[in-house]
């Protein structure tokens, strides 16, 4: 009897964890919140200025090890698909934009890096793990969201990007 109760307790715990994970809020299917952020070149950039293009927004932080892995993959994607209508934007959520800039310089990426030092934009995008990648379609709707990064995730990004570029 006791073993049965313990087993039921574990099963209920597993179900509650699974339910809570599936209930994580997402912006997929909703309009992407617009933002204006300062870029590394000193200009303010707005998401809305890229309306009509597919936009990959990657939220990252220098303290998130997965960001260091993901950025070169995103740079390759940017190089390959930029002329086809893809815009890649990296958004640092580090509080210290100077240290974030040093990190971005060291990563040598060819896409614009923006600074969200107050994390206000990150909150609007419901960030829950770093890095986080969002794909926005040509009409400004969030179509894909991925939290965290492991090698191979960029293949899922590519599938989504190709589909959005065909639309």
Segments (PLM) and residue ranges:
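Short active-site neighborhood of thiol/selenol oxidoreductases, capturing the structured segment around
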Residues: 48-65
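Structural microenvironment flanking redox-active thiols in thiol-disulfide oxidoreductases
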Residues: 68-107, 117-124
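Bacterial N-terminal signal peptides
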Residues: 8-18
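Positively charged n-region of N-terminal signal peptides that target proteins for export
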Residues: 1-4
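Thiol/disulfide oxidoreductase modules built on the thioredoxin-like
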Residues: 102-110, 116-162
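Structural signature of beta-strand start/N-cap positions in the alpha/beta core
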Residues: 53-55, 85-87, 112
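N-terminal "domain-start" segment that seeds a small globular fold
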Residues: 20-47
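Hydrophobic beta-strand core positions in alpha/beta domains
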Residues: 56-58, 88-90, 134-135
């Amino acid at each position: 009897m006791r073993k049965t109760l313990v087993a039921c307790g574990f099963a209920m715990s597993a179900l509650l964890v699974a339910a809570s994970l599936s209930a994580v809020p997402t912006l997929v299917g909703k309009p992407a919140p617009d933002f204006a952020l300062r870029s590394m070149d000193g200009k303010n950039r707005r998401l809305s200025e890229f309306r009509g293009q597919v936009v990959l927004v990657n939220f990252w932080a220098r303290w998130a090890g997965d960001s260091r892995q993901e950025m070169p993959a995103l740079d390759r994607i940017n190089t390959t698909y930029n002329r086809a209508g893809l815009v890649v934007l990296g958004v640092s959520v580090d509080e210290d934009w100077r240290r974030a800039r040093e990190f971005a310089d060291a990563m040598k990426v060819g896409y614009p890096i923006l600074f969200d030092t107050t994390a206000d934009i990150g909150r609007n995008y419901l960030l829950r793990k770093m890095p986080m990648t969002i794909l926005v379609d040509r009409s400004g709707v969030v179509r894909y969201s991925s939290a965290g990064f492991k090698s191979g995730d960029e293949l899922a990004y590519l599938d989504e990007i190709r589909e959005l570029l065909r639309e």
